[in-house]
Curated annotation (Swiss-Prot):
This is S-arrestin. Belongs to the arrestin family. SMART domains: Arrestin_C. It comes from Canis lupus familiaris (Dog). One of its GO terms (biological process) is signal transduction.
Length: 405
């Protein structure tokens, strides 16, 4: 994407995302695409709509926020549900103004100063019960939209006599996909640890396994060191130790399906003979880059292909109904031991235990710093890119068809 202006290299740039309707009657400006869910409250969507008064004469201009759950095509065939279910919709009229606007945010002040007249601020808020942006990755051969939760901000001009949004001419509307995301809490939980023991036939004493992690929360891309201690008091040999990061996606909105997918794994061929103890470490790095071809992996919602990653662990506010949260994501480390049998490989058995942890983004910069005064010279405008992903292919096709009309 090409910026529309240049700024001093010494000044920090504030990227402003803009998108203009096809008939150029309305243009929307947002300061960011990711809005943080702090569990107790969610950052509001604040922006500006630039209106061409001649082109919208006799019309009203609105901005709306929609949260939708999209079902995959396979889900429609199996359970007979519609393709999309709106979980939330809110709308505000920005032109003509219907009431005195509140104090503008720093972003809005700077944009109104930069853009001049015919600019109208808006503020859209999220209720605390909405899910975060998450989707289940389709396989490369899958066509159409995939299962997931997305958020859309829409600005549109509508005749005063029309009450239904679906009657809005596409040429007079503009849509932006945004994301609602969660970041790691400031306080970590206790150090994850699990122990398990198994009793085998013909062995008087058990096989004992202890697994521990150094902390409860890991950031995306951060190596996870797993400490494994095997105390083998049996007459059998532990032939292999394997550790996996497993992602569990619980689709709670229309069913209670669980999708458990390994997203990283490591193993050691170190053996633990009878009546001996071994302590070893295995390092795992769960990354989307190693799982791009795998169907059903939960991802943070997509805006651009390179912007996404494995879905972050879901944090649920106390008292919220889980069934409206779309897709809940959690992670655990599973450690498997392969134990020899009486007849060697033919009768080998596996035992395993799990340790939960959270995979998240680090806390962003201090909000007080992030909201420092926006200076005109630091505003860099970027056109909001059209979606070119499989899960948004249909919207792109519709947009292209509209452009050809």
């Amino acid at each position: 994407m090409a910026a529309s202006g240049k700024t001093s290299k010494s000044a920090s740039n504030h990227v402003i995302f803009k998108k203009i309707s096809r008939d150029k009657s309305v243009t929307i400006y947002l300061g960011k695409r990711d809005y943080i869910d702090h569990v107790e409250q969610v950052e509001p969507v604040d922006g500006i709509v630039l209106v061409d008064p001649e082109l919208v004469k006799g019309k009203k201009v609105y901005v709306s926020l929609t949260c939708a759950f999209r079902y995959g095509q396979e889900d429609i065939d199996v359970i007979g549900l519609s393709f999309r279910r709106d979980l939330y919709f809110s709308q505000v009229q920005v032109f003509p103004p219907v009431e005195a606007a509140g104090a503008p945010t720093k972003l809005q002040e700077s944009l109104m100063k930069k853009l001049g007249g015919n600019t109208y601020p808006f503020l859209l808020t999220f209720p605390d019960y909405l899910p975060c942006s998450v989707m289940l990755q389709p396989a490369p051969q899958d066509m159409g939209k995939c299962c997931g939760v997305d958020f859309e901000v829409k600005a549109f001009a509508r005749d005063s006599t029309e009450d239904e949004e679906d009657k809005v001419p596409k040429k007079s509307s503009v849509r932006l996909l945004i994301r609602k995301v969660q970041h790691a809490p400031s306080k970590m939980g206790p150090q994850p640890r699990a122990e398990a023991a198994w009793q085998f036939f013909m062995s008087d004493k058990p096989l004992h396994l202890a697994v521990s992690l150094s902390k409860e929360i890991y950031f995306h891309g951060e190596p996870i060191t797993v400490t494994v201690t095997v105390t083998n008091n049996t007459e059998k040999t532990v032939k292999k130790i394997k550790a996996l990061v497993e992602q569990v996606a619980n689709v709670v909105l229309y069913s209670s399906d669980y999708y458990t997918k390994p997203v990283a794994q490591e193993e050691t061929q170190e053996k633990v003979p009878p009546n001996s103890t071994l302590t070893t470490t295995l390092t795992l790095v769960p990354l989307l880059a190693n799982n791009r071809e795998r169907r059903g992996i939960a991802l943070d919602g997509k805006i651009k292909h390179e912007d996404t990653n494995l879905a972050s662990s879901t944090i649920i506010k106390e008292g919220i109904d889980r069934t409206v949260l779309g897709i809940l994501v959690s992670y655990h480390i599973k450690v498997k031991l392969t134990v020899s049998g009486f007849l060697g490989e033919l009768t080998s058995s596996e035992v395993a235990t799990e340790v939960p942890f959270r995979l998240m983004h680090p806390q962003p910069e201090d909000p007080a710093t992030a909201k420092e005064s926006f200076q005109d010279a630091n505003l860099v405008f970027e056109e909001f890119a059209r979606q070119n992903l499989k899960d948004f292919a249909e919207e792109g096709k519709k947009d292209r068809e509209a452009m050809d009309e």
